[in-house]
A protein has these predicted regions:
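Conserved adenine-nucleotide phosphate-binding loops and their immediately adjacent elements
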Residues: 1-19, 112-118, 222-245
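Residue-level preference for the first positions of well-ordered beta-strands
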Residues: 22-26, 53, 146-148
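Conserved nucleotide-binding/hydrolysis micro-motifs of P-loop NTPases
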Residues: 31-34, 59-63, 155-156, 183-188
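Sensor-1/coupling segment of RecA-like P-loop NTPase cores
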Residues: 146-151, 155-213
Length: 290
């Protein structure tokens, strides 16, 4: 039955896009459930109508990136529907000038770069501006093509992704619909509790949380995961780059989690890393301590 109810929630929001202002809802269920094989997902992905459909399913065992999946949605939609200079697009959306270099480098190479350091007294301001930038770019793209996003296991999201959802709840867009699937049995990171509670409160006030049932018996691999149990690739150069990307997008808590995972591998699993990568790792780790 959970398949039917989950699909029903997705269809309801999909059909509200462009007609109603508030189109963000949460679908809560017990135990684990994957949306990859839902018929409604395949159908909307293959639709040739005017709505851009995207879905993402987070893992319990891997670290979620900063602003995931919104960053890749922005890049994909810009390439497909707008083209041209991504920097000009950012200027049009009012992206803070210090953030454009980070976003441009991610768009072009997948590796974030920033010349200017972040001032300690500017951290909170820059985090707000980055979240606003992500939301404003999504809104601008939705003017070109209405946007439907389904994110399953959303409780595993990074703080930056959750902050983006909160911003979109507070500043709604009729052209964007979002369904957040949440396994109520598994909790997210401690660093996300405060903003998570604010999201739940906002959605509850709007009767936008649906309880769609249980996915069956609890599976052994579904539990709250400690950081040292999260999987990372043993290609440490890649893992360090992923943590560095998260840090450059100012999600310092999530970047610190990534660094702690790498550190655990090095200290307790006798993993080998070359000296150059080790130096870079400690530089990234130190910069997450904001």
């Amino acid at each position: 039955m959970i398949e039917k109810y989950y699909s029903g929630v997705i269809e309801q929001i999909y059909n509200r896009i462009g007609k109603e202002t508030r189109n963000i809802v949460m679908a809560n269920y017990s135990n684990d459930f994957s949306i990859e094989n839902l018929e409604v997902i395949r159908r909307y992905q293959s639709n040739e109508d005017n709505v851009f459909f995207a879905y993402s399913e987070f893992s319990y065992n891997t670290l979620v990136g900063a602003y995931e999946p919104f960053l890749d949605i922005i890049c994909n939609m810009h390439r497909r529907f707008i083209g041209g200079s991504f920097d000009d697009f950012q200027k049009e959306c009012g992206v803070y000038y210090l953030h454009r270099q980070v976003l441009n480098s991610y768009y072009e190479t997948g590796e974030c770069f920033r010349e200017e350091t972040v001032l300690l007294n500017e951290v909170a301001y820059e985090q707000r501006r980055m979240t606003m930038a992500i939301a404003d770019m999504l809104k601008r793209l939705s003017e070109v093509r209405p946007l439907m996003i389904v994110i399953n296991r959303f409780q595993m999201a990074s703080k930056s992704s959750i902050e983006t959802i909160k911003y979109l709840i507070d500043n709604p867009c009729a052209n964007i619909g979002i369904v957040l699937g949440v396994n109520a049995i598994v909790k997210g990171a401690d660093s996300t509790v405060e903003v998570w509670d604010r999201i739940v409160e906002s959605l509850e006030d709007r009767s936008a949380i649906y309880y769609i049932g249980s996915a069956g018996p609890l599976k052994n691999n579904v539990k709250t995961t400690n950081d040292d149990e999260l999987y990372i690739t043993m290609n440490f150069e890649q893992s360090i780059q992923e943590a560095s990307n998260i840090m450059e997008f100012l999600d310092f808590e999530q970047a610190r989690r990534g660094c702690r995972i790498i550190e655990h591998k090095l200290k307790f699993e006798d993993a080998w890393i070359d000296e150059k990568s080790l130096r870079r790792f400690y530089m990234v780790y130190a910069r997450t301590s904001v």
